[in-house]
Regions:
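Switch/coupling sub-region of P-loop NTPases
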Residues: 200, 204-215, 225-349
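Cys/His-rich Zn2+-binding cysteine-cluster or related metal-binding knuckle/ribbon modules and their
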Residues: 314-411
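Alpha-helical scaffold elements adjacent to nucleotide-binding pockets in ATP/GTP-utilizing enzyme cores
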Residues: 12, 16, 34-37, 132, ...
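Short, conserved loop/turn and helix-capping segments at secondary-structure boundaries
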Residues: 120-127, 193-197, 266, 314-318, ...
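NTP-binding/hydrolysis catalytic cores, primarily Walker-type P-loop NTPases
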Residues: 373-464
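Charged, alpha-helical scaffolding/interaction elements associated with membrane systems
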Residues: 90-91, 157, 278-279, 304, ...
Length: 464
């Protein structure tokens, strides 16, 4: 039995939790049920044990004795959350969604850009899971009415993963989304980005400029950060001072000065950029241009002798110029500052085990940009025959992704169109004349190579 007069214990609890302690009388049974519900849920224990058994069967026991012993000692809910993250990593997941429904907790994994249901559990697991994730993510465990953001790390198969956490109150409980990123995965060799030879040449040419602004554009999850970090790795030498301002810092790069935006402390993108300009930078990376003030400072920095790389959310390379104009940047400044724009998407690769090459019909040949006079020639394109038991893709029909790009390298003709207020359509037409592939053109090449399907092109690049 507890002692309601133990003031020392009450003070200790108050300090640890940051809350005021109130004494209540209850039964041992109610206390046990509360502990089981929030910290030792029998459902969590059952699911955690099931996960452990499945992992041993599928992957073998790749943990040493000490790791295995420590895992067994963990509370069931701790084991369960860790095992869900581990399973997500093994399935190449970018985001984990914990979604409270009326009577169930649905967990979905975003694999290769598409959400897939991974499991469902009893809704009673939700509160304990939320509490565990809030504690590890550095969030307020008592706040359930407001959205919260946090960050945590976890080691899976001896690789460290950075996990960004977002929690949103919904009618059935708090919804959690975890974004997983392997700390070493963002920076890669430029040849591994999936550029065609001509595109790689254009990319290298843009990075050779001592000043100007290079913009990478596309929707969330299109690989913009990977392209930016790869560019920075290319530029990172002893002779240059590189400073980044990011929200959040997605990966640490040795030799580069990285600044984390902190709006609560008044450190916005614009405020950070003003300070960075007093730090004698050669190259500046801005995680995202979100407003006119940031855009103005970025363009001014590019014109005054700095190389600036950043991202925007637009659908195409040409429309990026219009977006800057909409933010209040004068056309002559855009023309002077911008040295190149890269629009990009990620297409799913067709699973080699589920792929079957079939002749394209006339409509498909037309979509692929094949001239009508060549429609009589046989053209083979991939179709999927999904197999639920496929060990490569698990029945999805796709495994892995490849980048497609639209690289608009500035030329005197393009600069004239921008300076005179030309439209995005005029810009794109001139860029194509100068050799630029649009996203759809790049995607069609991957279909003809047998790497992806026309259905995937429709899903990802059809709006272009």
């Amino acid at each position: 039995f507890s002692d309601p007069l133990d003031m020392i214990a009450m003070d200790d609890l108050s300090i640890i939790t940051g809350m005021q302690i109130e004494i209540r009388v209850t039964t041992v049974k109610d206390v046990s049920q509360a502990l089981d519900r929030f910290y030792g849920n029998s459902e969590a224990m059952k699911v955690a044990d099931q996960f452990a058994a499945e992992r041993r069967e599928k992957y073998g026991n790749n943990k040493d004795g000490k790791e295995e012993s420590e895992e067994v000692k963990q509370a069931p809910i701790v084991r369960l959350v860790n095992q869900i993250i581990e399973q997500a990593v093994h399935k190449r997941t970018s985001d984990i969604h914990f979604e409270p429904l009326e009577n169930q907790l649905r967990i979905r994994f975003r694999v290769d850009g598409v959400l897939q249901e991974a499991m469902r559990h009893d809704i009673s697991l939700l509160s304990a899971m939320v509490a565990r994730i809030k504690i590890v993510g550095g969030m307020d465990i008592s706040e359930k009415r407001k959205p919260q953001d946090g960050r945590m790390t976890q080691i899976v198969d001896r690789q460290e993963y950075d996990i960004r956490v977002s929690i949103l109150p919904t009618v059935y409980g708090e919804k959690i989304v975890m974004r997983l990123a392997q700390k070493t995965a963002l920076s890669r060799d430029k040849k591994d980005l999936g550029f065609e030879p001509e595109e790689l040449h254009r990319f290298e040419d843009i990075l050779k400029h001592p000043n100007g602004i290079m913009l990478v554009t596309g929707p969330t999850g299109s690989g913009k950060s990977t392209t930016l970090y790869t560019a920075l790795s290319e530029l990172n030498t002893e002779e240059v001072n590189i400073i980044t301002v990011e929200d959040p810092v997605e990966a640490n790069i040795n030799g580069i000065n990285q600044v984390q935006v902190n709006a609560k402390a008044g450190l916005t993108f614009a405020a950070a950029l003003r300070s960075i300009l007093r730090q004698d930078p050669d190259i500046i990376m801005i995680g995202e241009i979100r407003d006119g003030e940031t855009a103005g400072i970025a363009v001014e920095s590019a014109i005054t002798g700095h190389l600036v790389v950043s991202t925007l959310h637009t659908n195409s390379a040409a429309s990026t110029i219009s977006r800057l104009a909409d933010m209040g940047i004068e056309n002559y400044l855009i023309s002077d500052a911008v040295i190149g724009v890269i629009a990009q998407r990620l297409l799913r690769r067709v699973c080699p085990r589920c792929k079957r090459m079939v002749p394209a019909d006339d409509l498909e040949k037309k979509e692929l940009g094949i001239p009508e006079e060549k429609w009589g020639e046989e053209v083979l394109i991939p179709h999927i025959e999904p197999n639920e038991e496929c060990l490569e893709c698990g029945g999805a029909g796709y495994k892995g992704r490849i980048g497609i790009y639209e690289i608009m390298q500035m030329s005197p003709a393009l600069k004239r169109i921008i300076a005179t207020g030309g439209t995005a359509e005029e810009l794109e037409k001139e860029a194509i004349k100068e050799g630029m592939n649009t996203l759809v053109m790049s995607a069609n090449k991957q279909v003809l190579k047998g790497i992806t399907t026309l259905q995937e092109v429709h899903r990802v690049a059809y709006d272009n």
